[in-house]
């Protein structure tokens, strides 16, 4: 099914990409270009948009980048990416919050619905189609993609438990859903709750069957109806805007709009109740979309609806926002049983080796990826690992459960285990690297 009514915005500015705990591996590489099974992260996003049927010839995908990363990302899209998705870049010269970014690109968002996703998300295209169908069918103002909990992977090494606990809280939300309709009525980040969670009792009057979850993850993929952009535009014109961050400010406001006659700090635009109007109709009007809000709001407030789309547990979705998740998605794709695959050809023994690599198949175990022009020395052993492009691995090196990026040199008799070795790193002979993240 072609998604002609939806325009996509990818926030690839690193800092605008939500919470991220990938230091130090993203210190010298733009977040959206981090290699996953030897493919840049953004390539997976462009692939799932294409598979989901997004038509981008008239309205391209908008990728928001900052000045420091724009050249590398533009180079990948223009010179290496071979897919059908059309892309338009918007370069930020200063650091802005997510609502401010949407205000800056307001003239580029021209369709009835717009989808905002962070540059760290990889998921199956089926979920996007289902989410888009839900948004249209229910005439939703906001649709949020939520992910059920995944089995925890044991972390090893000093400080693993403490770090994991802090990160679990960082990515935990208190989410209230009306069970029958799957309307989302509250979403509060755990980091914003100091002691007790405040729950608006008026919600129970209109949503009596509500369940509060602490184990659903906000994937930071949102679909908005076009009127929400009108709301942001008018808010940003105020001396003291209310909306800066999509998750912290805009979404709680939209959720509260589902309660009739609630007192609001910002009025809703008239376009909120005529969601099928085109942008040309809105732009050609000589009146503000807020001019007729007072009586209209009182009568039609109930038409504001916000929904959650819950992913099925058997489907694949990963936010690449922690090192643990980064390692996991590399392992997942190297297995070769997802809809996403490395660019290297797959062998009968379930590994992926580029034809230009100087490797003997007895050196490489299953679920490994070996990149372009990489050389393995005599008696090397590679198990459950990713090795990037133009790497030189010496004799007798053992690599297991690790990610080796591009242009890495590892001398003879080294042991690399459960580590990430970033671009251009040089490792001396006889070194042992276990559970480390090495950068140049």
Swiss-Prot record:
State the Gene Ontology BP annotations.
Answer: cytoplasmic translational initiation
UniProt KW keywords? Cytoplasm, Initiation factor, Protein biosynthesis
Identify the GO cellular component terms for this protein: cytosol; eukaryotic translation initiation factor 2B complex; guanyl-nucleotide exchange factor complex
Q: What GO molecular function annotations does the UniProt record carry, in alphabetical order?
A: guanyl-nucleotide exchange factor activity; translation initiation factor activity
Q: Give the location in the cell.
A: Cytoplasm, Cytosol
Show the InterPro entries listed in the entry: eIF2B_gamma (IPR051960), NTP_transferase_dom (IPR005835), Nucleotide-diphossugar_trans (IPR029044)
PANTHER family hit by this protein: TRANSLATION INITIATION FACTOR EIF-2B SUBUNIT GAMMA
Q: Whom does it interact with, and what assembly results?
A: Component of the translation initiation factor 2B (eIF2B) complex which is a heterodecamer of two sets of five different subunits: alpha, beta, gamma, delta and epsilon. Subunits alpha, beta and delta comprise a regulatory subcomplex and subunits epsilon and gamma comprise a catalytic subcomplex. Within the complex, the hexameric regulatory complex resides at the center, with the two heterodimeric catalytic subcomplexes bound on opposite sides.
> Main role?
Acts as a component of the translation initiation factor 2B (eIF2B) complex, which catalyzes the exchange of GDP for GTP on the eukaryotic initiation factor 2 (eIF2) complex gamma subunit. Its guanine nucleotide exchange factor activity is repressed when bound to eIF2 complex phosphorylated on the alpha subunit, thereby limiting the amount of methionyl-initiator methionine tRNA available to the ribosome and consequently global translation is repressed.
Indicate the family of this protein.
Belongs to the eIF-2B gamma/epsilon subunits family.
Designated name of the protein:
Translation initiation factor eIF2B subunit gamma
Species in which this protein is naturally found: Dictyostelium discoideum (Social amoeba)
């Amino acid at each position: 099914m072609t998604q002609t009514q939806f325009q996509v915005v990818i926030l690839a500015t690193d800092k605008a990409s939500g919470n991220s705990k990938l230091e130090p591996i993203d210190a010298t590489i733009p977040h959206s270009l981090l290699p996953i099974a030897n493919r840049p992260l953004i390539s997976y996003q462009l692939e799932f948009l294409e598979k989901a049927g997004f038509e981008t010839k008239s309205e391209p995908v908008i990728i928001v980048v900052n000045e420091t990363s724009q050249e590398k990302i533009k180079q990948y899209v223009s010179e290496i990416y071979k897919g059908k998705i059309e892309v338009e870049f918007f370069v930020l010269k200063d650091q802005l919050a997510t609502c401010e970014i949407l205000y800056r690109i307001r003239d580029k968002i021209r369709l009835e619905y717009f989808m905002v996703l962070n540059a760290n998300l990889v998921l199956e295209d089926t979920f996007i189609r289902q989410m888009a169908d839900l948004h249209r069918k229910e005439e939703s103002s906001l649709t949020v993609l939520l992910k059920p909990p995944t089995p925890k992977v044991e972390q090893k090494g000093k400080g693993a438990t403490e770090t994991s606990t802090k990160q679990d809280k960082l990515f935990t939300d208190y989410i209230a859903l009306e069970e029958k309709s799957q309307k989302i009525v509250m979403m509060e980040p755990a980091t914003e709750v100091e002691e007790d969670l405040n729950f608006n009792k008026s919600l129970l009057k209109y949503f009596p069957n509500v369940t509060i979850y602490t184990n659903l993850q906000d994937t930071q993929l949102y679909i908005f109806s076009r009127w929400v952009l009108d709301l942001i535009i008018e808010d940003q014109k105020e001396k003291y805007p209310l909306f800066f961050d999509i998750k912290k400010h805009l979404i709680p406001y939209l959720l509260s709009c589902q309660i009739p006659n609630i007192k609001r700090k910002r009025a809703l635009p008239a376009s909120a109740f005529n969601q099928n109007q085109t942008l040309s109709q809105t732009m050609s009007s000589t009146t503000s979309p807020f001019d007729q809000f007072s009586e209209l709001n009182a009568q039609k407030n109930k038409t504001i609806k916000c929904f959650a789309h819950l992913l099925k547990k058997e489907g694949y979705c990963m936010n690449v926002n922690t090192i643990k998740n980064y390692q996991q998605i590399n392992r997942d794709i190297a297995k070769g049983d997802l809809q996403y695959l490395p660019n290297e050809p797959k062998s009968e023994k379930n590994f992926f080796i580029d034809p230009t690599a100087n490797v003997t198949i007895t050196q490489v175990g299953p679920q490994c990826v070996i990149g372009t022009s990489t050389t393995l020395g005599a008696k090397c052993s590679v198990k459950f690992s990713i090795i990037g492009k133009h790497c030189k691995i010496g004799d007798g090196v053992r690599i297991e459960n690790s990610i080796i990026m591009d242009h890495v040199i590892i001398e003879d008799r080294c042991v690399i285990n459960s580590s990430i070795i970033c671009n251009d790193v040089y490792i001396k002979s006889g070194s042992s690297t276990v559970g480390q993240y090495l950068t140049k």
